[in-house]
Amino acid sequence: MPFTLGQRWISDTESELGLGTVVALDTRMITLLFPATGENRLYARNDSPITRVMFNPGDTISNHEGWELQVEEVKEENGLLTYIGTRLDTQESGVAMREVLLDSKLTFSKPQDRLFAGQIDRMDRFALRFRARKYQSEQYRLPFAGLRGMRASLIPHQLHIAYEVGQRHAPRVLLADEVGLGKTIEAGMIIHQQLLAGRAERVLIVVPETLQHQWLVEMMRRFNLYFSLFDDSRYSEAKLDSSNPFETEQLVICSLDFVRRNKLRLEELADAQWDLLVVDEAHHLAWSEEAPSREYQVIEQLAEHIPGVLLLTATPEQLGQQSHFARLRLLDPNRFHDYQDFVAEQQKYRPVADAVTLLLSGERLADDKLNLLGELIDEQDIEPLLKAANSDSDNSEQARQELVTMLMDRHGTSRVLFRNTRNGVKGFPHRFLHQIKLPLPTQYQTAIKVSGIMGAKKTVEARARDMLYPEQIYQEFEGENATWWNFDPRVEWLLNYLVANRHEKVLVICAHAATALQLEQVLREREAIRAAVFHEGLSIIERDRAAAYFASEEDGAQVLLCSEIGSEGRNFQFASHLVMFDLPFNPDLLEQRIGRLDRIGQMHDIQIMVPYLENTAQAVLGRWFHEGLDAFEHTCPTGRTIYDSGYEQLIGFLAAPTEQEGLDEFIHHCRQQHDHLKVQLEQGRDRLLEMHSNGGEKAQALAEAIANQDNDVNLVGFALNLFDIVGINQDDRSDNLIVLTPSDHMLVPDFPGLPQDGCTVTFDREQALSREDAQFVSWEHPIIRNGLDLILSGDTGSCAVSLLKNKALPVGTLLVELVYVVEAQAPKHLQLTRFLPPTPIRMLMDRKGTNLAAQVEFESFNRQLNAVNRHTSSKLVNAVQQDVHAMLQQAESLVEEQARALIEQAKQEADDKLSTELARLEALKAVNPNIRDDEVEALEFNRKQVLVNLNEAGWRLDAIRLVVVTHQ
């Protein structure tokens, strides 16, 4: 093309310079000035990496003074272009604008503009962009978003609760599963779903101080949710950046004590516009009508301001109906406003639970029971269903199930309360206790005697706590370097036990970090036993490494030595041998220790080894736990209640372990109390609530559906392709593991979701569960989600040129591959993507205006193509520019029909689904007071908004590829 002074060109290799103007010419060279940056570039006349900028009728262009022109005609005179059209700010028509007056900062965002301006991308990036569009659209359509990507086993009852609650608008529920059934994971799944769906953006978690790090670790490792921990120092720092420090972060964890201590802090928290509040250990919020505790009032104030509330408690309601009412009152103060009314309602509810038990038993129903069912369900056409349920016909079972569903919908607190018990959830191992009685060394006897004399002024509780750990008393007098492990018989016993069980993984838990560290040294030096240590002084990454070292089968540690606090929130189901080097102070901590191994997914019976020194507090406590509470071999829901009522007596026995008078009677009394409460619990078992919480077959089907989506081959192929193109280094390790590290030539300098020092990933859920240091990559993982955003929100792969070697077609045959996207813009919380995700429509146009996409599948077509360098690509584009314009116009008329059909289908689906949901909720509200008005209103508003936004859906060209046939 001949050059003329004043022509506008763009650099193919430095598009950031903007539009250049030809300012000097000679026989061999041309000079371009780039006014946007003030830089000059010298190019050879032949084969320079620059492209002529030419616009076409229908384009909108910008003048250097800031106004825009809709081009209607293009004139060329002496090699210079003049654009004629309508000025958009004044609507003046017939305005002429010479190309020299074009805005130099012009950027090309439309794929066709980038193609014609020579900003052509690589062919593999075009393919990645199309796949990203296709897979993203498919993922949006799949149900269970937010449940698939968690790094946890697919346990039906957990998935059922999370799915039920996570789908609701501003859920307000009480999660009351028994210990070891995974309430934290359920809460995490609900949070994850609410965040992914856009129903929540700001989440506050309030927990006891000792559980802060456990929650932080669980949210990060299982759900890739990075919470900020707010304590006094973090609060003071944030105060410098904002008048309300809590507005500086979206996801926050803090302790109940941190909130309780300061009135201003509480007000700031309440004003910080959270969407979801999660409170763990909610049974510690003491309440009575006359005097609610300060802790209760704090949570009550927050719950009034925050739309969604999840309360977590392991205490069954039968162990304190008043405190159970208090927790429900936090969730819905209008519904649960009077305690006496609540008690009366619960008594009415008893026959409902009995009726369900009867229906499930399969026995014939007496007339009085049939009448009761008729009254409880209160439907006009219930008679045929009752007859069918009581007959021997084939549909009797189905009729009974329908009646149970009707009862579930109408009665009790099943909308706000979920509780699973170990009786209702199968798959737990047995626990076997082995107590090993060892002599008390004279060194300890002396230290305890001296301590008794010198600590006479200590409180009974302080003395009791001291007496549990004789090695600490000894060190107190002999100094920190006192080598207690040389004479403590528990150490000798532990060494022998580990040597005898060389091939077993053993978890050893002790109360203090110092004990764990000293034991590790002894094991290493005396028997060369490989041990990992796990304590609160380690960072999360160091703990991950220690846990991975313990988990590794080949060259891993035989033993993991844990301190009490260090082990919180970590589970090691692959081990089944637990050694308690000492005992914890209360039954909750004991259950927490055993719970490290006693989880769903544990394949073996658990052997609990308790070496203890005779005539010490450990011996007393061991007896009380085992004989009084049966807490070693079975979970003990009654433990906290009995501990609280017998606390004074218990610490008296622990503080003076040699004075045993009355101990047998005390233990016997506790056992009676335990048995009595257990019977009460079993009688009060709420079958209806358990069925609702467990999810039954529906929950099984949900777990299977998600399991079927695991190991998606499309994900593995796409992820590896994405890592290659983004420029992430991949180092394959054994066991399906890949180490990802940033490289120096990435598409973006700091890839979101990829740590600076890299990370280990796997696509296998089981592998991720057994390796603490491996992240589980799914379509929901931040690396994949951020990768999709990176590709699709920018221009990566939006235009390309390829050659097709095919002797069956004439040389020079031109094909244009187009990817249109049909989408609707709307606030995230409306979840329009359920009905109309950004959906690609692929077209393959020939010069005759025929769309060949249906006959030519993308992947097989892509494999036949060859890449072209950028310079040759620009030349090809310039040669066929007019043809491509004509083919684009033909495609525009064809795509409209497909796009409108997609939009209509989405509108129909949304209307059907949301109207059905609304009708069901309204029908239930008429018979169940637990459905809040705001839930119905939110669903009605949501339906209207979804349909309005779908009506405004449109389509646009997202990517274009020019394909030219060659025979070489």
Curated annotation (Swiss-Prot):
Keyword entries, A-Z: Activator, ATP-binding, DNA-binding, Helicase, Hydrolase, Nucleotide-binding, Transcription, Transcription regulation
EC numbers for this chain: 3.6.4.-
Residues engaged in binding ATP: D177, E178, V179, G180, L181, G182, K183, T184
Name of the top EC class for this enzyme: hydrolase
Gene Ontology MF terms in the entry: ATP binding; DNA binding; helicase activity; hydrolase activity, acting on acid anhydrides
Description of how the protein assembles with itself and partners: Interacts with the RNAP. Has a higher affinity for the core RNAP than for the holoenzyme. Its ATPase activity is stimulated by binding to RNAP.
Keyword DNA-binding: yes
GO biological process: regulation of DNA-templated transcription
Gene this chain is encoded by: rapA
Function text: Transcription regulator that activates transcription by stimulating RNA polymerase (RNAP) recycling in case of stress conditions such as supercoiled DNA or high salt concentrations. Probably acts by releasing the RNAP, when it is trapped or immobilized on tightly supercoiled DNA. Does not activate transcription on linear DNA. Probably not involved in DNA repair.
Domain Helicase C-terminal: residue ranges: 490-664
NCBIfam families: PRK04914.1 (NF003426)
Motif (DEAH box): 280-283
Residue ranges occupied by any Helicase ATP-binding domain in the UniProt entry: 164-334
Organism lineage: Bacteria, Pseudomonadati, Pseudomonadota, Gammaproteobacteria, Enterobacterales
Protein name: RNA polymerase-associated protein RapA
Pfam family of the protein (one): Tudor_1_RapA
Key word Membrane present: no
UniProt cross-references to SMART domains, sorted A to Z: DEXDc, HELICc
UniProt similarity note: Belongs to the SNF2/RAD54 helicase family. RapA subfamily.
